Every structure is written in C-alpha cells, then in structure tokens.
C-alpha cells in the first residue's frame, strides 16, 4: 500500500464518520515563536484552546511537519527524520474517549479489503495513564488483551500545551515487530521492538503553572472536552509495506536509489555510507517540501534551516564520492516520489528546483574555498597541541568572511579528530551582533527600547495617523525623549530630540517606504526640523528632530507640516514599485514574489524571489509594460477590508509579514490590474508618476534578485544625462549615436589584440631566461639548489606557473631543488611562485611555507601545497628583498 493510499484510507474513514477533512496547513508556522509546523495539532490550537470556533466539531487532516531539533542525529539512526506527516482526528467538545478509542481500534484492525489497515490485533499494544482506568476498560471492551495494556506516568502519558490551557491523559498505540527487533515485555521493555504508531490525547482538564511534564497544577475539568490524536504516517507506511524503517518506504527510498546511482555505492553494505545515504534522503525531501511552501535559502530563520538542509545534502554526497552537482538528480526524484500525496508540487517545481540548484552551485564554491582554509586551521591545531582545537577566531573568519557555517566547521573538524573552540566563536558572534544592534539603534537615538515600552503604557488613546488625507495638522506634544535621558518634560535648543504627538500627518518608515520629513512649529516659538520618523515599537510614532530654536515642552500645541515635495516623490516611487512587482509577475510567473523594497524620492529598489538572472528582454518588457500603464493613467484606490476577503480578491502580500484582521488594499486600475496589501502612501492616478527607467537587475543572494529604477524626475534626469553622455561619446569617437556600439567593439578588439601581443612578448622573454637560470643553478655547490629570479613583467599568471614547473623539471631530482620566480602581473601587482622537487620536500622544505614568507615581505599573502604554491602582494619594489629572504630560508634546511 502506497503512503499516499495509507493517508487517503485514514481520511476516508473519518470522513465516513462525519469529520470535516481539511488540507494540510503550510509548513510555515503561524506562531512567531516557531519556524515550522512541528505537529499535526498545531493548526488546530485555536480550537483546542477555545480561542476560535471551529468550522465543524469533528475534523481530520494529514499535516506536513518539520522538526530540525535533532538534525545532527538524522541518518545515525533509522528513527530520526526532519520531515514527517501526521494523520490526526480531532473533536472539539463533541465525541470523547470511548469513540476515539473505538475509531482507532476499528481502523487499525479492520481488514484492508474492508477499508482498514489490517493489523493483527495480537500485535497491538496500548499504554494508558496510570490513573486512567477508564481508558483501560474501554480498550478491553474493544477486544484488546489486558496483558497488552501497560500503565505509564505523567512523563509519558499526560499531555499539555507546555503552558496554561487544556491538558489530559493520553493513550498510545504500539505495534510489536517481533523478537528479531528486541526483547519481549511490551513498550515499557523495548521501544525499538514495540513501535508507537498513534497517540490519543483526551483533553478533559484545565491546567496551569506548568513547570515540567510532571510538575503542573490541574485547575479542574473542562466544560468542553477535546480529542487530539496523531498517527505517524511514515511509521504506518513502513509497517504496512513490510519494511524495516521509514527510509525504506516508497516516498523516501527512491532518493537513496538515485544517490546509489550517482555514487556507485550500495546502500546496506557500509554503515558510514548508509548514514550519508539516509541524510541525503531525508534532507532532500524536507528541502523540497519547505521550498514548495515558499521558503528560500537565506542566512536567517527558516531560510537558514533550509540552507543547512541543502548544504548537508551536498556535503553528504561528497563524502559518498560525488563532486558533481547532485540536486538536479535528487530533487526530481523526490518530487516524483511525493507527488502522489502532493500533486501541487508540480506547480512550483521549476522555480523551486532552479533555486535549489543555484544554492548548490554557490555552496560548492564555498566548500572548495572553506575546506582549504579549514584544513590549514586543522593542521595548525594539530601541530600546536596533543589535543588539537581549531581556534574560535579561525571558525569565525570561516563563517564571517567565507560563508562557511559553524555547524559544517564542527562536523568537518570532528571527522579529523579535532575540536573547535565554539565558546570563542560564540563570543565573537555575540560581539558582532552587539555592534550591529548598536548601529541599528543609533537610528532611533536610543539604546533601550524599554523607554518606549514604558512611555506607551502611559498613553490614554492610540496615536492618530492622519497622513493619508492631511499633509499638515494641529497636534499636541505628548512626549519628548533625549538620548541618555529617556523621557523628559522639556528641551531647549539647539538639541536633537525625539517628539511624540497625539496625532500626526508624518508617515513613519515602514513596508519599504522611507519616512516623511518636514517641520514641527510650536505655538510657543519652538522650531523643529523633522529628519526621520520611526516606529521603534508597535503603534508608537516617533519624530526624530533637530530643535533649532526655542524651548519645547510636553503639552505644547504645535503645527506639524510634512515636506510636500518629498512626500509626492516617495508616493510616485511607491506606486511605481507596485507596478514593477505586477509586471515582473506577468513576465516571470507568480513565483516572482516580493522579498523587500525601498521607496525613496525619485527612485525605487525592488527585491524579488527568483533563482537566476532573467533575460534582458524580460526586464525591458517589464519597463515597457509599466510605462504603458502610466500612459493609460490608471486610477489608484485604497480600501480597508477583512484579510480573508483581500486574499480572495487576489491581493498580494509580503511573505512572512503578519497582518491584522482588517487590512488596507491598494488597487491600480478599475479592474484591479494590481492589488496589494499596503499601508503606504500613493498617487491617485499613475500618470502622475511620469516615467520609470530600470537601471539594473542583479543577484543580492541565493534565490533573490534586485531591480533598481529611477522614477519621475529621477527618470527624466537620468535620460538627460544619458543623452549628454551619448553626445560626448559621439563627438570623441566621431560617430553617430547609432554607430557607437560598432565603433566601441572595434576599439575593444584592437585593445585585446594589443594585450595578446604584449603577453606573448612577456612570455617569450620569460622563456628566454630559463636556460641561463637552469645552468647557473646546476653549477651551484650548495646542498639545496635554489633557483630565484626577478623576471619583471611576465603577463598572465599561468605563464609564471608553467615556467617555474619547467625549471624544476629541468633541474631533476639529484639534489633538493627550490625554484622561485617573482615579477609583476597584468595588473602591475607583484607575485611569486615556488616549486620544490621531491628531494627538497623530504628535507622538510615546503613551497607553501616559502611563499607565505615571501608574500609577507611584499605586503600580501599566499599559500598552496608542499610541491607548488603562489602568492602576491602590493609592493613591487620589494621583489628582490622577498626573493632573497626566500632563498635564505630555503638554504637553512
């Protein structure tokens, strides 16, 4: 029975028993404290807690889940996995214990021909809570052997949310896999032989003061009792398919088979390799499912977890001997295995897979660089101590400079028997974060958000934002703050202050839109220039000002006036951003979703999700589409409505942003050509924007692209500068504008030919110097024959390398030989290349060590292998000094 069919059979059974079948919720958790949906009951928590009314009192689902807490254990055992599916049936104040037990028993033991799973009743075992004799009796009434029912305490068989709320005893169902898997005695004796497949939670208590699973206070019985159950689909699948573990099921094992083909190895022949196979199978599936729900690789939150899954996959395949790209094989394999359960995977697979492949390419480059640097750090640690530890500074440099994750550093170091000073690494990371926080807080002129929290608690009513309709307003000063002093009653200028008004037309920076600027004038004569407006905490609008004249006091009546020209320019940019977003989606598809933006006077920046560079024709089409709509002068309207109604209309919203029940929808065009949830300011007709020119499109990270554009006056100014530049070039090159490209290409071709001839001349000069150098070195009576030469300009780096290796070959192996050539490359930077023969290496002379010393003299660095290394610097005047130092060091051996 396929996994998809096992799930369908479960849902069909409960649909027959009047349950509303709901689709799986997204893997992206609605709870801000968790990254992913980690349990089948998570989407139902509002109903279980009594916070919302369920659409029906009986419901069932197959919920996608991801848990990465034990990610390091994945593969080491066959029980751990990051992605899993949880079947569940729920009752919210409807049926209770007896029906839940009956449903579970009936579905498990009814024959497969009659719609059940066909488990042998003699192989089923139950656990109940110590005091729950009622559940025990109900199981016996269903036909369970009393000897197959075991009691467990609160640690195992009492469930709570982890805090105040519903709770109650649970009963777990196990399958006996037989004596080949462990000893007799039921789940209490051996949970490897007896595998848990289903947990029935009977929520009949209200609990609080939950300190641990065994330390809590039962307040009393719930008025409405709930049923919350969870059956692990993967466990059911491997038992019903006659397999030994989750990795051998139909939705997982195909990835292992694909990895076998890529590596040429066989699963089941070597435990170390098997661990890697299992890591790959699990992580590929998890990554595919996470990405299909909209997550993309990044350095924070869910994106970081995803990035780690993909990178562990690539690294595990490397440890299986595969250095070529692997995801183009593994991702389609996993999709094919999963699409019977999730046909929607096909809708986004092209964009998802391109993003994953791009992440693999980037990581392969990181891995090559980082591995070399880590090897140096590991070797250094081994040479310094009998109990080697990689310095925390080295681990931090790998992470900060080369993007090498600490988890990978720890893993790779451990494989070589070396520890990492993780405490020092964490200390350096904390220092870096502290610096970043301090920089961010400078913008708020305060370093302690509690000042704002304390002030907000004193507000009698919310601050009224008037800026959608009013450009100036009468207001009252209700708060004044100064850096280092917090809230103050009055300030005399000149001074930098933060001012809070009871009502304001000033827009605070949010949603990518920059803040308004302007002035605040008090009736008492105080003059304030408003430079910025921020919301340091929710619903608190803070004006960051320069008090240039007078004294400002709390309670003062003021006129607040925004800079109309700036507001208009920003509004034009913001509306243009919506239009660019819409046009991009028209050209690229619905996967091109917003990841960020900045709306500034006369310019915009728009970040969107896309895995590779769009064709230039696509960007041109986007620009043309936007300007066509500008000429149509579409109307821009705003309307507040319920969030669900807005989404039903097709309104776009920011990924990961939290919205209230009532949202503001900005629509462009009577037919809603563009609709977005947005709290920003906009023009009333797009014709007022004037023009949009897209200046550039580029990658800013894995799977994220950025468009920069100029808007309105910015676009007109740009076109004027472009016209002037074209005119200047036409005059200088004596060509019409339409001839410029051809003329420039001809000049570049001439320059390239000149460079080629120059490089050829340098190489000829370099080659001509070899015979004399070889002859002089052979005649040397020194125990170590050292050939050094300042070759001057040598052209391409490869020419220097080839010459060094050629000289080494001609000098042979009769004695230790070191060849060191230095000169100036195409960029006029000094470089040195060193080669050693086998006799020199046996004498302890390493090319890498010699290069590092010479490059240091040149003001740079370098390294390489014992037989060949190269490096460079910045001070070409010290080439002779560097070679002399190198020669002296080589002859010391």
From Swiss-Prot:
It comes from the Bacteria. One of its GO terms (biological process) is alanyl-tRNA aminoacylation. GO terms for molecular function: alanine-tRNA ligase activity; aminoacyl-tRNA deacylase activity; ATP binding; tRNA binding; zinc ion binding. Zn(2+) binds at residues 574, 578, 678, 682. Consists of three domains; the N-terminal catalytic domain, the editing domain and the C-terminal C-Ala domain. The editing domain removes incorrectly charged amino acids, while the C-Ala domain, along with tRNA(Ala), serves as a bridge to cooperatively bring together the editing and aminoacylation centers thus stimulating deacylation of misacylated tRNAs. It comes from Bifidobacterium longum (strain NCC 2705). SUPFAM superfamilies: Class II aaRS and biotin synthetases, Putative anticodon-binding domain of alanyl-tRNA synthetase (AlaRS), ThrRS/AlaRS common domain, Translation proteins. It catalyses: tRNA(Ala) + L-alanine + ATP = L-alanyl-tRNA(Ala) + AMP + diphosphate. Keywords: Aminoacyl-tRNA synthetase, ATP-binding, Cytoplasm, Ligase, Metal-binding, Nucleotide-binding, Protein biosynthesis, RNA-binding, tRNA-binding, Zinc. CDD domains: AlaRS_core. One of its GO terms (cellular component) is cytosol. PANTHER family: ALANINE--TRNA LIGASE, CYTOPLASMIC (PTHR11777:SF9), ALANYL-TRNA SYNTHETASE (PTHR11777). Binds 1 zinc ion per subunit. It is an enzyme of class 6 (ligase). It is found in: Cytoplasm. The lineage of its organism: Bacteria, Bacillati, Actinomycetota, Actinomycetes, Bifidobacteriales. The keyword Nucleus does not apply. Catalyzes the attachment of alanine to tRNA(Ala) in a two-step reaction: alanine is first activated by ATP to form Ala-AMP and then transferred to the acceptor end of tRNA(Ala). Also edits incorrectly charged Ser-tRNA(Ala) and Gly-tRNA(Ala) via its editing domain. Its EC number is 6.1.1.7. This is Alanine--tRNA ligase. Belongs to the class-II aminoacyl-tRNA synthetase family. SMART domains: tRNA_SAD. InterPro entries: aa-tRNA-synth_II/BPL/LPL, Ala-tRNA-lgiase_IIc, Ala-tRNA-ligase_IIc_anticod-bd, Ala-tRNA-synth_IIc_core, Ala-tRNA-synth_IIc_N, Ala-tRNA_ligase, Ala_tRNA_ligase_euk/bac, DHHA1_dom. NCBIfam families: alaS. Its cofactor is Zn(2+). Pfam families: DHHA1, tRNA-synt_2c, tRNA_SAD.
């Amino acid at each position: 029975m396929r996994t998809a069919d096992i799930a369908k059979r479960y849902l069909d059974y409960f649909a027959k028993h009047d349950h509303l079948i709901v689709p799986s919720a997204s893997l992206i958790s609605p709870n801000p404290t968790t990254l992913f949906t980690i349990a089948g009951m998570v989407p139902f928590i509002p109903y279980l807690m009594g916070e919302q009314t369920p659409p029906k009192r009986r419901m069932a689902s197959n919920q996608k889940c991801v848990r990465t807490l034990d990610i390091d254990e994945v593969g080491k055992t066959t029980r751990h996995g990051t992605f899993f599916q949880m079947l569940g049936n729920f009752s919210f104040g409807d049926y209770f214990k007896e029906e839940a037990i009956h449903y579970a028993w009936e579905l498990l033991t009814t024959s497969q021909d009659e719609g059940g799973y066909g488990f042998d009743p003699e192989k089923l075992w139950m656990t109940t809570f110590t005091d729950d004799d009622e559940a025990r009796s109900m199981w016996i009434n269903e036909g369970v052997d009393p000897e197959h029912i075991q009691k467990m305490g609160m640690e195992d068989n009492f469930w709570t949310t982890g805090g105040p709320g519903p709770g109650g005893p649970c009963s777990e169902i196990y399958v006996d896999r037989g004596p080949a898997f462990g000893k007799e005695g039921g789940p209490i004796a051996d949970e490897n032989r007896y595998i848990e497949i289903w947990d029935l939670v009977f929520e009949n208590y209200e609990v609080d003061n939950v300190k641990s699973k065994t330390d809590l206070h039962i307040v009393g019985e719930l008025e409405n009792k709930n049923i919350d159950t969870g059956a692990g689909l993967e466990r059911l699948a491997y038992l019903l398919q006659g397999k030994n573990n989750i990795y051998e099921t139909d939705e997982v094992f195909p990835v292992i088979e694909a990895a076998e083909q890529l590596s040429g190895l066989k699963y089941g022949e070597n435990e170390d390799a098997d661990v890697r196979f299992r890591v790959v199978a699990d992580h590929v599936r998890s990554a595919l499912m996470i990405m299909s729900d909209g997550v993309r690789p990044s350095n924070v939150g869910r994106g970081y977890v995803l990035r780690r899954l993909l990178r562990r996959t690539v690294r595990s395949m490397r440890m299986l001997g595969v250095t070529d790209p692997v995801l183009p094989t593994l991702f389609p394999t996993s999709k094919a295995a999963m699409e019977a359960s999730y046909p929607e995977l096909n809708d986004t697979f092209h964009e998802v897979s391109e993003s994953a492949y791009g992440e693999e390419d980037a990581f392969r480059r990181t891995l090559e660089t980082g591995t070399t640097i880590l090897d140096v750090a590991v070797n250094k640690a081994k040479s310094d101590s009998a109990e080697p530890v990689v310095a925390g500074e080295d681990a931090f440099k790998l992470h900060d400079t080369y993007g090498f994750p600490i988890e990978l550093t720890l893993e790779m170091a451990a494989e070589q028997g070396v520890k990492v000073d993780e405490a020092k690494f964490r200390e350096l990371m904390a220092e870096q974060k502290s610096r970043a926080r301090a920089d961010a807080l400078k913008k708020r002129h305060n370093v302690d958000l509690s000042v704002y929290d304390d002030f907000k608690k004193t507000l009698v009513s919310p601050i009224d934002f008037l800026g959608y309709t009013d450009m100036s307003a009468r207001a009252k000063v209700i708060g004044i703050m100064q850096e280092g002093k917090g809230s103050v009653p009055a300030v005399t200028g000149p001074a930098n202050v933060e001012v809070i008004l009871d009502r304001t037309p000033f827009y605070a920076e949010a949603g990518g839109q920059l803040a308004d600027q302007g002035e605040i004038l008090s009736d008492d004569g105080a003059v304030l220039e408003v430079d910025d407006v921020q919301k340091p905490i929710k619903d608190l609008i803070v004006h960051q000002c320069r008090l240039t004249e007078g004294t400002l006091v709390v309670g003062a009546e003021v006129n607040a006036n925004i800079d109309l020209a700036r507001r208009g320019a920003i509004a034009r940019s913001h509306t243009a951003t919506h239009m660019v977003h819409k046009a991009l989606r028209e050209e690229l598809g619905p996967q091109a979703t917003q990841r960020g933006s900045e709306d500034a006077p006369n310019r915009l920046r728009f970040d969107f999700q896309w895995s590779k560079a769009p064709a230039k024709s696509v960007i041109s089409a986007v620009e043309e589409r936007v300007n066509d709509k500008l000429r149509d002068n579409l109307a821009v309207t705003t309307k507040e409505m319920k969030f669900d109604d807005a989404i039903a209309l097709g309104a776009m919203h920011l990924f990961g942003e939290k919205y209230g029940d009532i949202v503001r929808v900005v629509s462009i065009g009577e037919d809603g050509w563009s609709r977005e949830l947005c709290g920003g300011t906009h023009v009333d007709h797009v014709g007022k924007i004037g023009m949009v020119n897209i200046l550039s499109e580029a990658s800013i990270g894995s799977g994220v692209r950025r468009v920069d554009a100029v808007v309105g006056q910015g676009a007109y100014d740009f076109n004027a500068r472009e016209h002037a530049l074209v005119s200047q070039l036409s005059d200088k090159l004596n060509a019409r504008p339409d001839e410029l490209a051809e003329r420039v290409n001809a000049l570049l071709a001439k320059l390239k030919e000149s460079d080629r001839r120059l490089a050829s001349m340098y190489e000829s000069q370099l080659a001509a110097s070899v015979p004399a150098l070889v002859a002089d070195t052979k005649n040397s009576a020194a125990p170590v024959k050292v050939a050094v030469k300042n070759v001057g300009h040598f052209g391409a780096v490869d020419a220097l390398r080839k010459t060094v290796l050629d000289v080494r070959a001609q000098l042979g192996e009769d004695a230790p030989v070191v060849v060191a050539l230095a000169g100036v490359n195409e960029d006029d930077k000094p470089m040195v290349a060193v080669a050693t023969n086998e006799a020199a290496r046996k004498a302890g002379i390493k090319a890498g060590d010699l290069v590092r010393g010479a490059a240091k003299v040149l003001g740079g660095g370098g390294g390489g292998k014992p037989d060949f290394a190269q490096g460079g610097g910045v001070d070409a005047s010290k080439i002779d000094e560097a070679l002399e130092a190198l020669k002296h060091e080589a002859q010391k051996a």
